[in-house]
Amino acid sequence: AGMRLGFAVANPELINSVFTVKNSFNHFPVDFLAQTAGKAACKNYSYYEENAKKIVNERILLTEFLRSKNWFVIESKTNFIFAKKDGMSGTSIYEAVKKEGILIRHFNTPGIEDFVRITIGTKEQMDKLKKVLVEI
């Protein structure tokens, strides 16, 4: 998450509107390293496509696992899931996995304070997380 590079696809009118106001909130700096990484990524599409498939697969497996353990999981099409376990606070889940060296996100925002956001990692990382979640 140290370097981010993105792109937008939109109606030309909308893109022009974004460029009209961009300097008032963000000038979209893209340094040389990000540009170089972006070029390399475009040249190796199959690598990223394969990684995306792995992330989707691990997300599905984690969602199914959590639901089988009576967690409420919001449907996701991203590289993370948003979930909660009845009877457990988001803080207690966060602290329990943190003790095992696993970092997830917890928000103290009213309405979502019992949810955690879990970023999908490698199979090994997700297996470790599942093991920890069963124990709490």
Regions found by a protein language model. Give the residues of each.
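PLP-dependent aminotransferase class I/II
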Residues: A1-L66, W71-I74
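Short acidic/glycine-enriched loop/turn segments that link adjacent beta-strands
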Residues: G2, K77, G111-D114
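Thr-Gly-centered strand-to-loop micro-motif
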Residues: M3, A83-K84, I104-H106
